[in-house]
């Protein structure tokens, strides 16, 4: 097996150490461990999109109607701050990701426990402008997949209403989100990436 092929295999043995340390339910810990010695790298709070909105050129008639402070827009951070990004350092393709932790309606709780809106805030990722930017910057142009991955955590992952809601939103793009349920292993998270998403980075 060649060096390049080896670098494309995830370090599954690293998960054993995480189980022992109790760090297995932290996405950053999990992927930093399994990516060690591979061609994949995890960025925490990546900066690739930090100035995205400042680059928008507005029409003159709009400029005349809004406040225009005397600042250098190139120094601003008017953009998007994903929670993580995964890059294949050979192809330079990038998958941007969000972590949405939210309460939910489960055994012993009232239905009102599912009233949070973290999951709704993730809907901005479906907007035409961000889809285009994520594809351009990340290099994932295959239309059978979206250029982002959302990992849901907490009791929302077992809420009968919210799970149906999210399933409906993603329609035939079910691979673009993962319900990381409480006490579920990091192995399941990595398995989803490995089987459903990694091929779009290769």
Curated annotation (Swiss-Prot):
Keyword vocabulary terms for this entry: Endonuclease, Hydrolase, Nuclease, Restriction system
A GO biological process held by the record: DNA restriction-modification system
Pfam families, per the entry: RestrictionMunI
UniProt keyword annotation of Hydrolase present: yes
Molecular function GO labels: DNA binding; type II site-specific deoxyribonuclease activity
Reactions this protein catalyses: Endonucleolytic cleavage of DNA to give specific double-stranded fragments with terminal 5'-phosphates
Enzyme class: hydrolase
EC annotation from Swiss-Prot or TrEMBL: 3.1.21.4
Domain of life from the UniProt record: Bacteria
Oligomeric form and interacting partners: Homodimer.
Protein name: Type II restriction enzyme MunI
Protein's organism: Mycoplasma sp
């Amino acid at each position: 097996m060649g060096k390049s092929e080896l670098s494309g295999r995830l370090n599954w043995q690293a998960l054993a150490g995480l189980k022992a340390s109790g760090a297995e339910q932290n996405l950053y810990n999990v992927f930093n461990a399994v990516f060690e010695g591979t061609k994949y790298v995890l960025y925490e709070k990546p900066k690739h999109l930090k100035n995205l909105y400042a680059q928008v050129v507005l029409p003159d008639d709009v400029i005349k109607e809004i406040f225009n402070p005397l600042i250098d827009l190139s120094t601003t951070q008017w953009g998007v701050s994903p929670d993580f990004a995964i890059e294949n350092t050979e192809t330079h393709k990038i998958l941007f990701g969000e972590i949405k932790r939210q309460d939910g309606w489960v055994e012993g709780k009232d239905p009102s426990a599912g009233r949070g809106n973290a999951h709704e805030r993730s809907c901005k990722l479906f907007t035409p402008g961000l889809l285009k930017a994520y594809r351009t910057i990340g290099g994932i142009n295959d239309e059978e997949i979206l250029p982002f991955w959302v990992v849901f955590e907490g009791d929302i992952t077992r809420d009968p209403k919210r799970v149906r809601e999210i399933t409906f939103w993603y329609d035939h793009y079910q691979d673009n989100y993962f319900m990381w349920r409480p006490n579920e292993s990091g192995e399941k998270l990595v398995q989803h990436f490995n089987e459903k998403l990694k091929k779009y980075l290769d």
